[in-house]
Amino acid sequence: MQITVREALRDAMQEEMIRDDKVFVIGEEVAEYQGAYKVTQGLLEQFGPKRVIDTPITEYGFAGLAVGAAFAGLRPIVEFMTFNFAMQAFDHIVNSAAKTHYMSGGQVKCPIVFRGPNGAASRVAAQHSQNYTACYSHIPGLKVVAPYSAEDHKGLMLTAIRDDNPVVFLENEILYGHSFDVPKTIEPIPFGQAKILREGSSVTIVTFSIQVKLALDAANFVQNDNIDCEVIDLRTIKPLDTETIIESVKKTNRLVVVEEGWFFAGVGASIASIVMKEAFDYLDAPIEIVSGKDLPLPYAVNLETLALPSESDVIEAVKKVCYYSI
């Protein structure tokens, strides 16, 4: 059976709204229009306007309302049309949702999911293309999820909605329409468990979200040169499955990290730091990080392509750590 990522997310929200009447969806155009990317399709008809709530264009307003509802015991799912617009709600996410459980000595919980597309799509320019994975992962009190497959989107969304504290669920606009094989039943997937999608012995490639496809395609390409890549899909960035990464590096002795976001203070830099500390003696080559270029993403399609990680970038990094002549 195959379903799209869009359907997987919708099914997860639908199941949790049936299971728990405290769950509700709020955001711009989530009700009548059924979501900017049709992720909330059919939910208004099934659950009504009290649980699927259209809002004005005011992220600061509806995010704050949702955080307050979570403090009061409800379980909001906040949809941002894009995480670029969540910048307007950053104060509520960081200073209220993420910190209150700690500041209250564990007395106040904030069971809320902030979800929507993150990162580049196709020619939506610099202000609509930023990747916030590293930004949110930097903040104590937030769990950060960035899946690739439909099964993982659904399983991790089920877990996110049931979590008693805030989860930032980073989706990808291009992935919404992608179809994946899924089992008949998808159970909640625990946070902090990476998935080895391809076993190998020559080099470890660690990545997440839509970059997983780049990694798999690159791994298949270099197989022709007898380079056997192990590809790890992180699925959750925080908590990070450090153990799976370290054990893989101990086996392959080489590491390439692929992320769409910027290099400086990025996810790749954090992973490289951890591996250098925990598995330095196992490394046979310097760690390579493939990332987006250090500039606002251009609108022109040729420049946009050059600014984002590509399959050839991953292939070059893999060959470099294997000391293979390029």
Curated annotation (Swiss-Prot):
Q: What is this protein called?
A: Pyruvate dehydrogenase E1 component subunit beta
What are this entry's molecular-function GO terms? Answer: pyruvate dehydrogenase (acetyl-transferring) activity
Question: Could you say which EC number(s) this protein's record lists?
Answer: 1.2.4.1
> Which species is listed as the source?
Rickettsia conorii (strain ATCC VR-613 / Malish 7)
Which UniProt keywords are given for this protein, alphabetically ordered? Answer: Oxidoreductase, Pyruvate, Thiamine pyrophosphate
Which domain of life does the UniProt lineage start with?
Bacteria
Key word Transport present: no
Which cofactors?
thiamine diphosphate
Q: Which reaction does it catalyse?
A: N(6)-[(R)-lipoyl]-L-lysyl-[protein] + pyruvate + H(+) = N(6)-[(R)-S(8)-acetyldihydrolipoyl]-L-lysyl-[protein] + CO2
- Broadest EC class? oxidoreductase
Q: What does this protein do?
A: The pyruvate dehydrogenase complex catalyzes the overall conversion of pyruvate to acetyl-CoA and CO(2). It contains multiple copies of three enzymatic components: pyruvate dehydrogenase (E1), dihydrolipoamide acetyltransferase (E2) and lipoamide dehydrogenase (E3).
Q: Which residues cross the membrane?
A: none
Gene name in the database record? pdhB
Assembly and interaction partners: Heterodimer of an alpha and a beta chain.
> Which of this chain's residues are annotated to bind thiamine diphosphate?
59
